[in-house]
């Protein structure tokens, strides 16, 4: 594993810290290492939730490493099968990822956060997609994911001028889930991770699968699709041991013991 990444396992929770001073910028080598970490997380049955954060208190990530670019790394370089930062193009990850944004999330750093399922950020965090000012475009998910969260007027200003969005503004628009102090950031992310662990893993997988498949469908079409039998996790949930365990635990006034089957 790359020296730029620190991995910590806390039971079913994996913490990934990107540590590349000064700005946690990401070159192709680092992107490959991040992709390996996320794919291992996907494939490890003992892991349930991942938290991605940046080292230090100033930068979550400044995105693409412009020093590497100046040395010849092309904008369309191979960043690995998971896409830039290892997560932006993993489309079969049925476990939740939390971005704990500890500071500036610019360019590909913002796109990394957008690829997560939840964003918890520090009060000093801010978000921007300044690629147009560098002669490129935010094509690692920024131009695809941000329009699903914000009105066109806001998106256009952010992607065409590089305007920054503060943590509080991001919270108002629903781009982030929580804004906390820097000192509370990781505790808040871990609290959310534990809440996710408390939910049934098959149910979480089915929810992510349904979101991916039906997010652009009319409601009626979505109903037909999820009942058509083509989904992997949804039918499994309905006939799982966990589907029996949940109501049984509720009736017995105890915490459920999920088996993931």
Curated annotation (Swiss-Prot):
The pathway is: Amine and polyamine metabolism; carnitine metabolism
Which keywords does this Swiss-Prot/TrEMBL entry list? Answer: Lyase
- The domain of life is Bacteria
Q: Which GO terms describe its molecular function?
A: hydro-lyase activity; L-carnitine CoA-transferase activity
Q: Which reaction does this chain catalyze? A: (R)-carnitinyl-CoA = crotonobetainyl-CoA + H2O
Supply the EC number(s). 4.2.1.149
Q: Supply the InterPro entries for this chain.
A: Carnitinyl_CoA_dehydratase (IPR022852), ClpP/crotonase-like_dom_sf (IPR029045), Enoyl-CoA_hyd/isom_CS (IPR018376), Enoyl-CoA_hydra/iso (IPR001753), Enoyl-CoA_hydra_C (IPR014748)
The residues annotated as the active site are 111, 131
List the Gene3D superfamilies: 2-enoyl-CoA Hydratase, Chain A, domain 1, Lyase 2-enoyl-coa Hydratase, Chain A, domain 2
Single Gene Ontology BP term?
Answer: carnitine metabolic process
What protein family does this chain belong to?
Belongs to the enoyl-CoA hydratase/isomerase family.
Q: Explain the purpose of this protein.
A: Catalyzes the reversible dehydration of L-carnitinyl-CoA to crotonobetainyl-CoA.
NCBIfam families per the UniProt record, alphabetical: PRK03580.1
Protein name, UniProt field = Carnitinyl-CoA dehydratase
Q: Give the gene that encodes this protein.
A: caiD
């Amino acid at each position: 594993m790359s020296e730029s990444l620190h991995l910590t396992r806390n039971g079913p929770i994996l913490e990934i810290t990107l540590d590349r001073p000064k700005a946690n910028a990401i070159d192709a080598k680092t992107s490959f290492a991040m992709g390996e970490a996320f794919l291992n997380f996907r494939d490890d049955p003992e892991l349930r939730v991942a938290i991605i954060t940046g080292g230090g208190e100033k930068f979550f990530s400044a995105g693409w490493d412009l020093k590497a670019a100046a040395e010849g790394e092309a904008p369309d370089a191979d960043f690995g099968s998971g896409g830039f930062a290892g997560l932006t193009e993993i489309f079969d990850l049925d476990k939740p990822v939390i971005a704990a944004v500890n500071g500036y999330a610019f360019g590909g750093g913002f796109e990394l956060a957008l690829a997560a399922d939840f964003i918890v950020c520090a009060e000093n965090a801010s978000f921007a997609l300044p690629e147009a000012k560098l002669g490129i475009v935010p094509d690692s998910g920024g131009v695809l994911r941000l329009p699903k969260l914000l009105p066109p007027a806001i998106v256009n200003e952010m992607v065409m001028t590089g305007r920054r969005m503060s943590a509080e503004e991001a919270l108002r628009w629903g781009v982030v889930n929580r804004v906390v102090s820097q000192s509370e950031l990781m505790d808040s992310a871990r609290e959310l991770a534990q809440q996710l662990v408390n939910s049934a893993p098959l149910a979480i997988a089915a929810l992510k699968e349904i979101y991916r498949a039906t997010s652009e469908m009319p409601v009626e079409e979505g109903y037909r699709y999820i009942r058509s039998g083509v989904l992997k996790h949804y039918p499994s949930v309905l006939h799982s041991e966990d589907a029996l365990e949940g109501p049984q635990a509720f009736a017995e006034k105890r915490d459920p013991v999920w088996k993931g089957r």
